[in-house]
Amino acid sequence: MAEFMGELRRTAYCGTLRKEDVGKEVVVMGWTQRRRNLGALLFVDLRDKTGLVQVVFDDTTDSEVFDKAQAIRSEYVLAVKGKVRERESKTNKIATGDIEILADELKILSEADTTPFEILDDTNVNETLRLKYRYLDLRRPSLQKNLFVRNEITKAARKFFDENGFTEIETPMLGRSTPEGARDYLVPSRVHEGCFYALPQSPQLYKQLLMIAGFDRYYQITKCFRDEDLRANRQPEFTQIDVEMSFVEEIEDVMYPIEGLIKGIFKSTIGLDLGEGHFRTMTYKEAMENYGSDKPDTRFGLKIVNCSDLFMASAFKVFTDALAIEIGPIRGSVRAINAKNLADKFSRKELDATVEFAKTMGAKGLCWMTWQKGGEIKSSFAKFLTPEDIENIKARMDFCEGDVLFFAADKDYVVFNTLGGLRLMIAEKHGLIDKDKYDVLWVTEFPMFEWSEEENRYMAVHHPFTAPMTEDLELCETDPSKARAKAYDLVINGQESGGGSIRIHSRDIQKKMFNILGFSEEDIEKKFGFFVNAFNYGTPPHGGLAFGLDRLTMLLTKDESIRDVIAFPKVQTASCLMSDAPAPVEQKQLDELYIEVKGE
């Protein structure tokens, strides 16, 4: 039966006690990790958020207390009063391995049923069961550590913002739906029949309005929501560290101060000094052409090389057809990567599997060329190659004995996606990535627009409030495919950790941007009227960015799953296995909201 604490009050945390505390009388409280009964001697490992400490009940313990201790089982919640003493059999497996507590008072604050799985870091239990009992899963030290790191990140962020003149301001959770990009989560209004709020995908408009209002430097750590198909490391609700600054006009005006934030976070959470200089910068064009991604992982080589000019007159129709592609601004190319010294890892079976992998990345196929050490050059398109072609490939690709080449030929974006994915797969599979390294860089000069083959029009790469580079302003109208944005992404180890832009602060340019994107005057007024109207009353140059707190925590803890750095995450069906959300509601609630649920 559960007891009350009575006069006992905690004086120490379990995992903080050390040899220097020997002789002290302490009160500790926590959960029973395990219990070992040796008859006249009883050991209990007591656990709280700081770690474990061994509690001992022996022949000097009051008989009533000793008898009570016999009832202790795993995950019972205890309050123990006793004296710290040096352990006879020390251990370096836990931080408190030099000491133990000889108990003289015990209260069993709560009993526990047998748990569905052991509360251990190395427990081999499927994630579905863990998420169903998430409150038990969160008792595991590794998950608690992740959330403590997350807390350290927000502490470091708030410290930086406070020291640099930023004001924390909350923006609305219930706003207007502007269905661009991902789908909104809609919230029906009971008061306004047939009308809906939308949960924010980001505080974008509000934070820009705060700059127009004169707050100069704003931040908040806020929830955002996107009703999109979930991928491995996406969540329907996620947390952003959101920033906006006034009187900034060039990308460095935002990037350079924010580097101080990132350096502070790395230093305070994992003790890593990222150095004094500015982070490396790479243009979008460089990133795509060399790494096949706008979030390049540069911890390893395997750079993409353009070989288009080598095959302009090729007899290989796959290549020449790709080079002939012209669809609006879209062009085709032939590009390759060299997996140096890995030819012996690619049997014919492995080569075929690699071709199949390329197809999952959107390619119609993949060509290869391999040169085994001491052997001859073999290729999937050998009959179309002349001796001169092979010599040109050797020179262009630094192709040597022991290497294997992979060629992709298609529209540029297909080639980039294919070879970008392939280089990551090869690097991961063959141990080319230094997992202890943090590679931090900015990617800049993104395109303002991208051509949609489906809609046969230009779409905004980021959002319609991003400013074009000053020298590209005219290109927005004359040749949108060449216009570059004052946009920037922070990439850490091949993960987009944050991104932002300098914003448009001119009313005329903002309207022009809407027009280029195909918005009618009616659309502009309906979706953004309140925002555009604010531009009539004096708008400072401004810009900002947002960091994904979940993603940043995952990178710093080196976890593979974003679910392991969120207290109560959703699974890939956007549902919570613990609470069974989402769930049907009563008809009365639907009636109050004027909602009718249609059957399939």
Regions found by a protein language model. Name each.
Residues M1-E600:
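Class II aminoacyl-tRNA synthetase catalytic cores and aaRS-like
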